[in-house]
């Protein structure tokens, strides 16, 4: 953010990308280099990032264009490679800017996938312009990785849905204008008894005031629903189709989480290279030591490994959109795409953690100084290994697929 560091662009020449993606990456990097946002107050900063990203039309990559551009998107469909490029570039400069962008996409993704034309027209253009802040409310205190165990209830009577329960670890909690919320509509059916709803922030009975402080500050809150009454048009997608919709939404954005991790890792490497070339010790620079060169080489390889898996996962999804075939072929393709996204998310986030830790070690004491870029990256990367599917969940997805 406002940094003299610039992200590399040579990877944009890889065959995963086309001219649109290459232009996007270069334009966004130039724009981000000029931005200065005070991030000392994470809620205020996120609102500011959403405003800027919306005003400058970057949020248009969070939603599809719709007929004649009516939904406000930049491209005809949600493009996974564009999402990866945007998140990688934003995260290189500011993980909080990346968070602000990502939650607009995740929070509105289910509306893109399953919303009625009226729901899409009501919400998606305002998400794309930054006029409304979106949130995705799935997790609960006892239902994180085991999302199917959620206990929030939705009961139906006389054409009205009544929501009771709570959600926690909700990104954009307390600042969002609406929450795509998942609730049990038939507990006896387990995961097949979950339905999604769109709940506006000003709905009576919704309390989002319980903020959660974490090691890398960003807006998180617990939501409490006390007899929240919703009209029938608040239901999102099919009755009892909520769990499938939640998983489809997460699948779309999983590769982009990996992209964000790659961006943070690239920034850590840039910081380490710059510092090692300047730091003098024992009559030479830190970069002159073979041990430093070995560490830098390992960091670069770790980044590329994660990046290539990430770009492959995004490309596979985009190709499936372009070449839709038979239902049988699509089922096989879905499995392949899910595994590819899991590999990308697992590898990119775990490798980014290693790269940032190695970069911090090269900085010595300066690496743990509060306020330094490496110190903040060290805090920022940790949660990325957990949210939208922890590393262990990705390992299970991959392992089960290999054993089939």
PLM ranges: what are they?
Residues 149, 202-231:
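Flexible, small-/acidic-enriched active-site or ligand-binding loops
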Residues 164-206:
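A short core secondary-structure module
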């Amino acid at each position: 953010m406002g940094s003299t560091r610039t992200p590399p662009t040579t990877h944009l020449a890889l065959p995963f990308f086309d001219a649109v993606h290459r232009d996007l990456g270069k334009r966004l990097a130039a724009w981000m280099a000029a931005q200065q946002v005070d991030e000392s107050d994470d809620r205020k900063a996120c609102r500011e990032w959403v405003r800027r990203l919306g005003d400058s039309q970057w949020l248009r990559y969070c939603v599809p264009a719709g007929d004649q551009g009516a939904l406000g998107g930049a491209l005809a469909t949600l493009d996974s490679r564009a999402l990866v490029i945007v998140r990688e570039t934003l995260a290189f400069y500011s993980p909080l800017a990346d968070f602000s962008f990502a939650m607009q996409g995740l929070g509105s993704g289910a509306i893109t996938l399953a919303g009625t034309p009226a729901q899409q027209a009501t919400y998606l253009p305002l998400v794309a312009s930054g006029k409304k802040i979106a949130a995705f409310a799935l997790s609960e205190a006892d239902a994180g990785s085991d999302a199917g165990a959620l206990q929030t209830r939705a009961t139906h009577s006389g054409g009205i849905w009544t929501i009771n329960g709570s959600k926690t670890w909700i990104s954009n909690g307390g600042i969002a204008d609406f929450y795509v919320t998942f609730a049990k509509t038939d507990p006896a059916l387990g995961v097949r008894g979950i339905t999604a709803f769109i709940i506006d922030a000003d709905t009576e009975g919704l309390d989002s005031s319980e903020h959660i402080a974490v090691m890398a500050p960003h807006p998180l809150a617990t939501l409490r629903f006390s007899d929240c009454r919703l009209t029938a048009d608040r239901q999102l997608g099919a009755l009892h189709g909520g769990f499938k919709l939640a998983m489809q939404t997460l699948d779309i954005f999983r590769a982009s989480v990996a992209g964000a991790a790659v961006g943070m890792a690239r920034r850590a490497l840039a910081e380490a290279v710059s510092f090692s070339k300047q730091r003098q010790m024992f009559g030479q620079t830190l970069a002159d030591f073979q041990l430093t060169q070995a560490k830098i080489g390992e960091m670069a390889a770790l980044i590329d490994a994660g990046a290539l898996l990430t770009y492959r996962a995004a490309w596979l999804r985009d190709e499936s959109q372009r070449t839709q075939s038979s239902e049988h072929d699509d089922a096989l393709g879905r499995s392949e795409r899910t595994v590819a996204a899991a590999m990308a998310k697992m590898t990119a986030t775990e490798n980014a953690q290693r790269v940032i830790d190695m970069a911090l070690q090269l900085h010595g004491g300066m690496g743990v100084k509060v306020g330094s870029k490496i110190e903040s990256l060290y805090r920022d990367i940790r949660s990325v290994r957990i949210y939208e599917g922890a590393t262990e969940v990705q390992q299970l997805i991959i392992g089960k697929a290999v054993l089939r």
